[in-house]
Amino acid sequence: MLDDIRGPGDLQGLSKRELDLLADEIREFLIHKVAATGGHLGPNLGVVELSLALHRVFESPYDPIIFDTGHQAYVHKILTGRAGDFDTLRQKDGLSGYPSRAESEHDWVESSHASTALSYADGLAKAFELTGQRRRHVVAVVGDGAMTGGMCWEALNNIAAAEHRRIIIVVNDNGRSYAPTIGGLASHLAGLRLTPSYEKVLDESKKLLRGMPVVGPLAYALMHSLKVGVKDAVSPQVMFTDLGLKYVGPVDGHDEHAVEDALRRARGYGGPVIVHVITRKGMGYAPAEDDEAEQMHSTGIIDPKTGRAIKASAPGWTSVFSDALIDVASEHRNIVAITAAMPGPTGLSKFGERFPDRLFDVGIAEQHAVTSAAGLAMGGLHPVVAIYSTFLNRAFDQVMMDVALHRLPVTFVLDRAGITGSDGASHNGMWDLSILNVVPGMRVAAPRDASRLREELTEALAVDDGPTALRFPKGEVGEDIPAIERRDGVDILARPASGLHADVLLVAVGSFASTALATADRLGKQGIGVTVVDPRWVLPVPPHVVELAGQHRLVVTLEDSGVHGGAGSAVTAAMQDADVDIPSRDIGVPQQFLEHASRGQVLEELGLTDQHIARKITGWVAAMSREIGDSTVNPAAQQVD
């Protein structure tokens, strides 16, 4: 049946039996396609019936459907004509793992960071109202913990104040965080509450009873209490109705007919409505259902029959951090950890198992996480905030004003720093150095290998007079890279080959150390002498890096980060402050949003490989030599293979 679905319109004539068969087929399709490419499997297996119902009830794209978070949108993509592209999911020039405005008119926003859909919906509904398009509905599908984010409640406060705006909020509750009651009574009461005649009778009764002397207010209070009491007995979602929003549910999210019925009732109400749908993450796929921790939230390439990874992965940066933190925390009871709903992905699950009273999962609430960490530090503890680099952006003010201003010992561990690749523009961690570079008193380390990660984490946790941060990339950790020597905290990784001048100081930031060494080897073969250093602590710039800069003809910083305001900018500024008048260049990530592809493909496209970097440095050195008439550089160095 799936071959016949080229758009939402093809769903309209299907019977209940056909819809059930289509749901089964979609699940099989997802399992086999995502197994081959990797992606967010569990969340999408849980929204099959919900997605079918949404596209049968609403007229997308006329009625925008906004997914929060966007990794729930695979079925939406299938139903809007993109099933044929799933072999390219998260691949270069292929289908994005999130909604993409470039892919389809059905994708209104690039929704990948959580808790934003309700604000988008609020703005769209206001725009439709002001432009005379009041009959259009806006649907926000909020799930996978997004309701724990403060933005959702800020938006709800505004949405509830406009009773006439057609905003349908679908709460996809797959975490069982509420105590749902699913059944006929709940469905009946939901229908009753959304019936216009019920609202009219209730309003008229309020006016009549309030106008009656003595007994009127009492009768009204009794009537109101009875309604509230029955409602509370059926569903605990008083928080929504207390805000002034109509509420329907809970609804069995795997009964397409029930979900569709609830959505049609909500659509007919004409104002903002909450539709509470109970779903099961990983539904219909035993390996996901049996994964109690994450329900196969996100997978690499797997065997579709067993759900097991095809390739055994080597130790990753996250696992090294996880073990290192436990080791240090075992000796220092003041160390605690905070996660924003991601204990597994950030490596804190094992910490929580070992020290359950020292791990705090605050939900998708990065701002709260950082200020809560500040409070923990004020209380004499040393909190570790483990967070994806890209999500640190959401809490910049808290880092600046609540932690740094108070010179508090909080350590930020920034996972997925630099180019992440297949998750696309929203998940590349290319902004953290630029952000942290402006924070007074912030010290940032970028370990080049596993040993340095353990070493620098220990050093960070010993700092008691201000904030620190460690950044490392996604993926496997390579072999340790030994230093020739360490001077004033700076590791010397390579010196110019015998007989070559100290032409270039190559400052390698973090995991780019291996690329820097390969670049130096290429340049050495062309007669260009290169010193490679790892500052270890890249912000503020160590004085010895500036001292070494004065001993070379050119300084080049190589970083897996944005070039504006990053480590290279800091090196240049430090040289200027010290009156070191040596040319400096920065090689890093251009300040632009990058399309999804593998990390290697993105680096190749950006020219961040040793071959491209060597060619660029060769050109700079040759140009400098021509300007001063220096013949000490091998002319062949103008071409680097």
Swiss-Prot record:
Residues annotated for Mg(2+) binding in this entry: 144, 174
UniProt catalytic activity: D-glyceraldehyde 3-phosphate + pyruvate + H(+) = 1-deoxy-D-xylulose 5-phosphate + CO2
Cofactor note: Binds 1 Mg(2+) ion per subunit. Binds 1 thiamine pyrophosphate per subunit.
Pfam families reported for this sequence: DXP_synthase_N (PF13292), Transket_pyr (PF02779), Transketolase_C (PF02780)
Organism of derivation: Mycobacteroides abscessus (strain ATCC 19977 / DSM 44196 / CCUG 20993 / CIP 104536 / JCM 13569 / NCTC 13031 / TMC 1543 / L948)
Listed EC numbers: 2.2.1.7
Its biological purpose: Catalyzes the acyloin condensation reaction between C atoms 2 and 3 of pyruvate and glyceraldehyde 3-phosphate to yield 1-deoxy-D-xylulose-5-phosphate (DXP).
GO annotation terms (biological process): 1-deoxy-D-xylulose 5-phosphate biosynthetic process; isopentenyl diphosphate biosynthetic process, methylerythritol 4-phosphate pathway; terpenoid biosynthetic process; thiamine biosynthetic process
Gene that specifies this protein: dxs
Enzyme class of the recorded protein, top EC level: transferase
GO MF entry, a single one: magnesium ion binding
Protein name: 1-deoxy-D-xylulose-5-phosphate synthase
NCBIfam families: dxs (TIGR00204), PRK05444.2-2 (NF003933)
SUPFAM superfamilies tied to this protein: Thiamin diphosphate-binding fold (THDP-binding), TK C-terminal domain-like
Family: Belongs to the transketolase family. DXPS subfamily.
Subunit relationships: Homodimer.
Cofactor(s) needed: Mg(2+); thiamine diphosphate
This protein's GO CC annotations: cytosol
Residues at which thiamine diphosphate binds: 71, 112-114, 145-146, 174, 285, 366
Lineage, opening ranks: Bacteria, Bacillati, Actinomycetota, Actinomycetes, Mycobacteriales
Keyword annotations of the record: Isoprene biosynthesis, Magnesium, Metal-binding, Thiamine biosynthesis, Thiamine pyrophosphate, Transferase
Pathway: Metabolic intermediate biosynthesis; 1-deoxy-D-xylulose 5-phosphate biosynthesis; 1-deoxy-D-xylulose 5-phosphate from D-glyceraldehyde 3-phosphate and pyruvate: step 1/1
SMART domains according to UniProt: Transket_pyr
UniProt keyword Magnesium, yes or no: yes
